[in-house]
């Protein structure tokens, strides 16, 4: 059975885990109502996308 030859150091373990982080979604202000929304999506509060009303 495969067994590690040496114990993994704190530094190596932490360097490996640097990529396991959460990312904050790209929030922007809506041009119409100035509420925060996700980029490239319809505004949930007013229903505008690129200056055009697309949702009720």
UniProtKB/Swiss-Prot annotation:
<dbReference type="Pfam" id="PF01783">
    <property type="entry name" value="Ribosomal_L32p"/>
</dbReference>
<dbReference type="InterPro" id="IPR002677">
    <property type="entry name" value="Ribosomal_bL32"/>
</dbReference>
<dbReference type="InterPro" id="IPR011332">
    <property type="entry name" value="Ribosomal_zn-bd"/>
</dbReference>
<dbReference type="InterPro" id="IPR044957">
    <property type="entry name" value="Ribosomal_bL32_bact"/>
</dbReference>
<keyword id="KW-0689">Ribosomal protein</keyword>
<dbReference type="GO" id="GO:0006412">
    <property type="term" value="P:translation"/>
</dbReference>
<keyword id="KW-0687">Ribonucleoprotein</keyword>
<dbReference type="GO" id="GO:0003735">
    <property type="term" value="F:structural constituent of ribosome"/>
</dbReference>
<comment type="similarity">
    <text>Belongs to the bacterial ribosomal protein bL32 family.</text>
</comment>
<protein>
    <recommendedName>
        <fullName>Large ribosomal subunit protein bL32</fullName>
    </recommendedName>
</protein>
<dbReference type="GO" id="GO:0015934">
    <property type="term" value="C:large ribosomal subunit"/>
</dbReference>
């Amino acid at each position: 059975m495969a067994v590690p030859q040496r114990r993994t150091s704190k530094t190596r373990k932490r360097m490996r885990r640097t990529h396991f982080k959460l990312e904050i979604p790209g929030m922007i202000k809506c041009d119409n109502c100035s509420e925060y929304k996700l980029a490239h999506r319809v505004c949930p509060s007013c229903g505008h996308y690129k200056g055009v009303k697309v949702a009720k």
